[in-house]
A protein has these predicted regions:
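Bacterial N-terminal signal peptides
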Residues: 7-21
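N-terminal secretory signal peptides that target proteins for export/translocation
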Residues: 1-7
């Protein structure tokens, strides 16, 4: 084969507080980008607090994920991701791929369409993490194909986000959202002023409602999250124009928080109770809003602090642990810790890896994946950044390691281009 090792960009995310409805049937599952509640925080406990010099035990590694930036969805003993030019196929097209969680064996691969070959070589490839719901899974290709598959790989329906829904991207890097499943609805972000957000029947793909945000620049790369404000369910999302809140029942645009035009808006928002934190890179920074109920099921957003460049994050994502935010400074490989309510930086430190860092959290620790292939473990504390282990991921270093890590059931799962690796991190 063909494609050297690639991993994840244009994806990001994070929330804390509200669960995503109807995305998993198993108790132990990671059914969409950044997990069941889209927090990037795993419920796992009893994990290693330090790693050996060469890293935790490698349980298995497998090939056949293809070129791509997508992370992993894990449900009912199966792992799903998106990639193109798989080492297990004889073409360069894009596929949704399924692996056995226990062994890493590839179970099936179903074609979605053409590969994404636009832009710099290291920015090409697949990028949307699948969303799994019961016996179905949903993917968005970079070209804007929204496809529903059965979990055995059979295609059920597809919609073209650009052609069918008038979608528009705010940049030239393709679509990468992981769609939201909420009850019977699939909710996605076509982007643009006509159909900024859309809700579809998850079983048939039929359009239920769309939301228009005047002069919206187009979809970014975030995956939306859910809030509940005074009895009103709100879908919170960011586009190329900034943050927005949409009433879940009918798609009514409730509020917007506009930002200046920037290169790309990638990280997903963080929701805790009535608070919304969102951030973007390229000098934009992070802001904190409070959602306030008004009347007749409407909600407004009030600014607690404005976009603060010190809180900027390009694509590695930010996690909220207790009352502090943790993320990479832009894409510099310099993790930061900040107070959620004030935005004040508590610490900022260089880690053992280099370049951009994506992270997840579990059991009071940060799992920091630097794009040069270094995987690090650090305690999630406002006191200081101190690593208690790091290792070089096999096969890394040829291209950026951008796929977000997943911690589930005592294991650390990493996507490294065509390879998926499983590590035992249980403290037993």
């Amino acid at each position: 084969m063909r494609c050297p090792c690639f991993s994840t960009i244009l994806l990001t995310a994070v929330i804390c507080g509200f669960s995503v409805s109807a995305v998993a049937t198993a108790e132990e599952a990671w059914p969409t980008f950044r997990g069941p509640e889209r927090t990037g925080v795993s419920p796992d406990t009893g994990l290693l607090t330090a790693w050996p010099e060469d890293g935790p035990k490698l349980v298995w590694s497998t090939s056949g994920a293809g070129r791509g930036y997508a992370s992993l969805a894990i449900v009912d003993g199966k792992i799903y991701t998106l990639g193109d030019g798989l080492s297990t196929t004889d073409d360069e097209d894009e596929y949704v791929v399924c692996f056995d969680q226990a062994t890493g064996k590839q179970l099936w691969a179903s074609k979605t369409g053409e590969a994404w070959n636009s832009g710099k070589p290291t920015w090409q490839g697949s990028r949307s993490t699948p969303t799994v719901d019961g016996d179905r899974l949903y993917v968005v290709t970079p070209h804007g194909q929204l496809i529903c598959f059965q979990t055995d790989g059979k295609e059920v329906w597809r919609r073209d986000i650009k052609e069918d829904l008038g979608g528009k991207k705010a940049d030239s890097w393709g679509y990468s959202e992981s769609v939201l499943i909420d009850g019977d609805k699939l909710v996605c972000t076509p982007g643009g002023p006509q159909h900024t957000m859309a809700a579809l029947d998850k079983m048939t793909g039929e359009t239920l409602w769309t939301t228009a945000r005047a002069e919206d620049r187009g979809a970014g790369h975030a995956s939306m999250v859910i809030a509940s404000i005074g009895g009103t369910k709100v879908y919170v999302q960011t586009t190329g124009s900034g943050a927005m809140g949409v009433r879940a029942s009918d798609g009514k645009l409730l509020w917007t928080y506009d930002i200046k035009k920037t290169t790309a808006v990638i990280p997903s928002p963080i929701v805790r109770d009535d608070l919304v934190f969102f951030t973007a890179g390229y000098g934009t920074g992070g802001a904190l809003l409070r959602q306030v109920p008004t009347s007749n099921g409407e909600v407004k957003a009030e600014e607690i602090y404005p976009t603060t460049p010190a809180l900027g994050n390009k694509h590695g994502g930010v996690v909220l642990v207790d009352d502090h935010l943790y993320g990479d400074t832009e894409d510099r490989g310099t993790p930061f810790c900040a107070e959620l309510m004030t935005g004040d930086i508590v610490w900022k430190s260089r880690g053992s890896g280099r370049n951009s860092a994506s992270m997840t959290a579990a059991d009071g620790y940060l799992y920091v994946r630097f794009s040069n292939g270094t995987m690090a473990l650090a305690k999630a504390t406002p006191e200081e950044y101190e690593e208690s282990g790091s290792f070089k991921v096999p096969g890394s270093g040829r291209n950026p390691s951008w796929a977000h890590p997943v911690v589930l059931d005592g294991k650390l799962y990493l996507r490294e281009g065509d390879d998926v690796l499983c590590y035992d991190i249980a403290d037993s």
